[in-house]
């Protein structure tokens, strides 16, 4: 009964409002084991978190060459070391940029697109020179170095960016350990323009934009909660202000912050985020996640 209640609770805020591609057209019996697992996660009948461990053999050993997970384990360990500040036990700018890069690579897509999405084009084309991506250029250069280092092992930039986003979350204390699936093909064609939300969009504009990406209003709030670790690097001069008071940690302070009448000292709130927090269509979900990290984690990993 407790498990059933958890599934029902997750379904209230399903990030994906609909399935598409093979997940929508193929019957369960026609899907691969991995396809079934991904479908179950998207439908909130399976958990997107995992505590399963993996002990990798030596990098140059025949065993590692035969096991695709082995190469990714070495990449993951290297990335995590670049994202987590052990001295302060916080995540750093590379972690938060990696989260954003994963989102920008995947979200430049909608149901009408014939290309785009999580295809690695953020690294493989000139997308990092676009205004909405320019603040990530330095982090992108670092990620390109990782890609070049392991390219001979057959990795894709598309998978690397999504792994980087998940590890960026994990590098922030409190971040959930999100399951990772590899196998995304690369496409160097620049992503379609105009499919990422500007910071001055209203809640209704954001909801309409994400509906075309199959993301529900509740899913938008779960997704935008990643701003708990973000900083506004578009600000002119001085340190980049955070979007809540604890940018080095993965907590629900972001939701608390945006339910307050005015911003806390030193905090910058994007107009779009404030609009979402005030909207009758998304504001109740801000309230649901405020102080309820477990509830937010359950939804955000799906």
Where do the model's predicted regions map?
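Catalytic cores of secreted/periplasmic or lumenal enzymes
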Residues: 1-302
């Amino acid at each position: 009964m407790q498990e059933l209640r958890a599934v029902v609770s997750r379904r209230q805020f399903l990030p994906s409002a609909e399935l598409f591609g093979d997940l929508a057209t193929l019957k369960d019996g026609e899907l691969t084991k991995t396809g079934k697992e991904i479908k179950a996660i998207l439908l909130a009948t399976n958990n997107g978190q995992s505590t399963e461990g993996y002990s990798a053999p030596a990098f140059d050993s025949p065993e590692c060459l035969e096991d695709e997970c082995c190469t990714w384990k070495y990449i993951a360990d290297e990335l995590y070391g670049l994202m987590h500040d052990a001295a302060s036990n916080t995540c750093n700018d590379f972690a938060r940029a990696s989260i954003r890069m994963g989102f920008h690579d995947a979200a430049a897509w909608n149901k009408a697109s014939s290309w785009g999405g999580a295809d690695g084009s953020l690294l493989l084309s000139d997308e990092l020179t676009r205004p909405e991506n320019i603040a990530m250029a330095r982090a992108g250069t670092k990620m390109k170095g990782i890609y070049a280092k392991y390219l001979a092992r057959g990795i894709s930039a598309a998978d690397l960016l999504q792994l980087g986003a998940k590890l960026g979350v994990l590098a922030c204390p409190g971040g959930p350990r999100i399951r990772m699936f590899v196998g995304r093909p690369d496409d160097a064609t620049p992503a379609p323009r105009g499919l990422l939300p500007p910071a001055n969009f209203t809640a209704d504009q954001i909801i309409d934009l994400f509906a075309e990406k199959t993301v529900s209003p509740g899913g938008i709030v779960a997704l935008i909660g990643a701003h708990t670790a973000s900083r506004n690097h578009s600000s002119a001069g001085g340190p980049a202000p955070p979007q809540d008071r604890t940018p080095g940690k993965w907590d629900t302070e972001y939701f608390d912050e945006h339910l307050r009448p005015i911003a806390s000292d030193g905090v910058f709130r994007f107009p779009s985020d404030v609009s979402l927090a005030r909207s009758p269509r998304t504001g109740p979900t801000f309230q649901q996640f405020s102080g309820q990290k477990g509830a937010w984690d359950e939804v955000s990993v799906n």
